[in-house]
């Protein structure tokens, strides 16, 4: 083990913790932990206009939820500008950089001219070798790197191999802006050196930046960290990952009911493998992770595989843990987890509980993927599940679990057992209720009322008797009964639900018709 290994995750706080960024963080974390090294966190917030505190908090909470704990204090680039300024001035003094007074308007004019001439634009500053004695006093200059005009830069990448870039294709990039703030390129190099980063693992979309950063490394005389640029995650159709493919923040996956252990396992397998192993615990991942097993081709986001893997991890939890997680979600997010249909008083229930929000199900016709997007609405009153309801959910958990791949699906089914809440009827179940034989439902109520034993076998036998007496198939009777009792068209066994909820609750739901 090499305990001198230091990796870093360096997101920009301009939005949520993207799933691709989470995978990058995971790979850096695993590599550091495998070598008993350090995994550092740096927030690249030099873009003051786009960086937000909310995004910083989303990054922190996302990493913590995934279990990717970092070493030491978080580094904020916005607090280190003096360090960057000193570094830029050092290059200036050593003849590796220069003051440039060219106005932005002139640069844009040259860029437009190159575009019109269908030429690749590389800005060549007239101030590169000017004598300081002729510097203007009415213009605030930027500091530019004096990139060598001859030769080339070679990127030694552990995954991509050697990538050679001619110096003539690298511009004299700005290191320090006219207002004295550092650019991304300078800050990254100075920070990686100052933090002692030994290995950089990031997306291959950074590969073009790497050549420019290596030019800065050379100017300073810094040792270059080991570079590994991993292919990006693509959508199921092979296109670059976007929101329509599921390029959501980690918080969204949490809200959709994925477990952190499952998501880490899934992200690990997106571009890394260990033989034929699919189920890999975090402990195993730390033991096994290496850069040699990274794939060179982009991985495709596959929700079916993600769901299947999550179902496996759900089934590894014991009944108490599953019940606790389900109850917690119901209590904290009841208003965003259950599909809403306009409440009708005749459908009964405790009207103090909210039915004011839903999960919006949207299907992308181009990909066939279905997305569940939580819509936040405030609860009018605090929602608290009773001990009796918790008991119902715990008793029903085995049958709920076999029908669920995510905590969201599990919670959706568990709401059947909230006897003090109004039933939330799907549109299909409402249509079944409105079109059903009301006299048949009354007959069912009368027959069930007479039952002394209300276990699932007795209830099932009674329904068979009713079906035979009316010359109907059992399924024909169960459709409206299921809709009335659960608000759904598909659910766990009605006979099991009846046994758990008991006669009084079942009759109450049937009588709302």
UniProtKB/Swiss-Prot annotation:
GO molecular function: ATP binding; glutamate-tRNA ligase activity; tRNA binding; zinc ion binding
Chain location of the short sequence motif 'KMSKS' region per the record: 240-244
GO CC term, one of those recorded: cytosol
Binding residues annotated for ATP, in chain numbering: 243
Enzyme class name: ligase
A Pfam family that the UniProt record links to this protein: tRNA-synt_1c
Motif ('HIGH' region): 11-21
Cellular localization per UniProt: Cytoplasm
EC code: 6.1.1.17
Domain RPE1 insert, chain residue ranges per copy: 335-383
Keywords: Aminoacyl-tRNA synthetase, ATP-binding, Cytoplasm, Ligase, Nucleotide-binding, Protein biosynthesis
Protein role: Catalyzes the attachment of glutamate to tRNA(Glu) in a two-step reaction: glutamate is first activated by ATP to form Glu-AMP and then transferred to the acceptor end of tRNA(Glu).
Subunit and interaction comment: Monomer.
HAMAP family with a match to the protein in the record: Glu_tRNA_synth_type1
Similarity annotation: Belongs to the class-I aminoacyl-tRNA synthetase family. Glutamate--tRNA ligase type 1 subfamily.
Protein name, UniProt field: Glutamate--tRNA ligase 2
Native species: Rickettsia conorii (strain ATCC VR-613 / Malish 7)
Lineage, opening ranks: Bacteria, Pseudomonadati, Pseudomonadota, Alphaproteobacteria, Rickettsiales
């Amino acid at each position: 083990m090499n305990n001198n290994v230091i990796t870093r995750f360096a997101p920009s706080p301009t939005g949520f913790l993207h799933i691709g960024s989470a995978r990058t963080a995971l790979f850096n974390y695993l590599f550091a932990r495998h070598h008993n090294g350090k995994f550092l966190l740096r927030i690249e917030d030099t873009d003051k206009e786009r960086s937000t505190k909310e995004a910083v908090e989303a990054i922190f909470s996302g990493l913590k939820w995934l279990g990717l704990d970092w070493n030491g204090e978080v580094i904020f680039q916005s607090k280190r500008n003096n360090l960057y300024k000193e570094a830029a001035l050092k290059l200036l003094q050593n003849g590796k950089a220069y003051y440039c007074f060219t106005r932005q308007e002139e640069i844009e004019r040259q860029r437009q001219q190159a575009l019109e001439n269908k030429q690749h634009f590389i800005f060549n500053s007239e101030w590169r070798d000017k004598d300081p004695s002729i510097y203007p006093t009415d213009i605030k200059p930027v500091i530019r790197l004096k990139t060598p005009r001859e030769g080339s830069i070679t990127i030694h990448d552990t995954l991509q191999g050697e990538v050679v870039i001619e110096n003539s294709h690298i511009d004299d990039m700005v290191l320090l802006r006219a207002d004295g703030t550092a650019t991304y390129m300078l800050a990254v190099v100075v920070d990686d050196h100052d933090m002692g980063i030994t290995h950089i693992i990031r997306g291959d979309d950074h590969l073009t930046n790497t050549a420019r950063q290596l030019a800065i490394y050379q100017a300073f005389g810094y040792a270059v960290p080991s570079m590994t640029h991993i292919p990006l995650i693509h959508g199921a159709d092979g296109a670059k990952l976007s929101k329509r493919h599921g390029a959501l923040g980690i918080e969204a996956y949490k809200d959709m009911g994925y477990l952190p252990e499952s998501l880490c396992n899934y992200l690990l397998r997106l571009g890394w493998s260990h033989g034929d192993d699919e189920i890999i615990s975090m402990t195993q991942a730390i033991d096994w992770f290496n850069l040699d097993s990274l794939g060179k081709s982009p991985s495709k986001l596959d929700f079916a595989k993600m769901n299947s893997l999550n179902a496996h991890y759900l089934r590894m939890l014991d009944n108490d843990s599953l019940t606790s997680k389900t109850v917690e979600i119901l209590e904290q997010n009841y208003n965003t987890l259950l599909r809403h249909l306009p409440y009708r008083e005749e459908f009964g229930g405790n009207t103090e509980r909210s039915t004011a929000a839903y999960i919006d199900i949207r299907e992308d016709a181009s990909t066939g993927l279905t997305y569940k997007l939580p819509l936040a609405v405030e609860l009018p009153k605090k929602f608290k599940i009773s001990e009796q309801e918790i008991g119902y959910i715990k008793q029903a958990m085995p049958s709920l679990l076999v029908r669920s791949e995510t905590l969201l699906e599990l919670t959706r089914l568990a709401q059947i057992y909230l006897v003090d809440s109004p039933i939330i009827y799907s549109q299909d179940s409402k249509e079944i209720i409105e079109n059903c034989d009301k006299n048949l439902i009354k007959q069912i109520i009368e027959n069930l009322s007479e039952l002394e034993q209300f276990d699932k076998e007795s209830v099932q036998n009674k329904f068979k008797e009713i079906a035979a007496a009316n010359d109907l198939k059992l399924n024909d009777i169960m459709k409206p009964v299921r809709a009335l009792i659960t608000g759904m068209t598909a659910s766990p066994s009605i006979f099991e639900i009846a046994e758990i909820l008991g006669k009084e609750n079942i009759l109450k739901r049937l009588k709302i018709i």
